[in-house]
């Protein structure tokens, strides 16, 4: 994933659908490799240090809630944010929201996503 594309999406300069189109094949390849070999690679290019804000996290969650971005793509984006040295969280609420999206053990329900969005509004 290109750092610049992820930041553009988080900042609202790239629509969720455009972001999904741009990274969809990469996400599918990673998920397929994980299913078939038990190992998938998450890669994000280097970029300037970016502080992930509550607005950024809300944009990611709202894209999932509004079905403008699949959970799989949002999950991959969250993995990229967490694994990259070029992203930092503005506060604990942002940290929790990104880790919520990163947890792919069970896809969250719409109610859980809405509750996570609400937490960022406090």
Which residue stretches match the model-derived regions?
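Acidic, Ser/Pro/Thr-rich low-complexity regulatory regions
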Residues: 1-122
């Amino acid at each position: 994933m290109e750092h610049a594309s992820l930041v553009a999406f988080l900042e609202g300069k790239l629509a969720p659908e455009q972001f999904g189109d741009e990274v969809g094949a990469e996400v599918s390849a990673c998920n397929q490799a994980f299913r078939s070999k038990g190992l998938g690679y998450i890669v994000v290019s280097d970029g300037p240090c970016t502080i992930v804000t509550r607005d950024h996290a809300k944009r990611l969650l709202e894209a999932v809630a509004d079905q403008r971005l699949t959970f799989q793509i949002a999950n991959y984006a969250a993995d990229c944010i967490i694994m990259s040295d070029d992203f930092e969280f503005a506060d604990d609420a942002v940290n929790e929201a990104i880790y919520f999206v990163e947890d792919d053990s069970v896809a969250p329900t719409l109610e859980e996503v809405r509750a996570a969005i609400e937490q960022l509004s406090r």
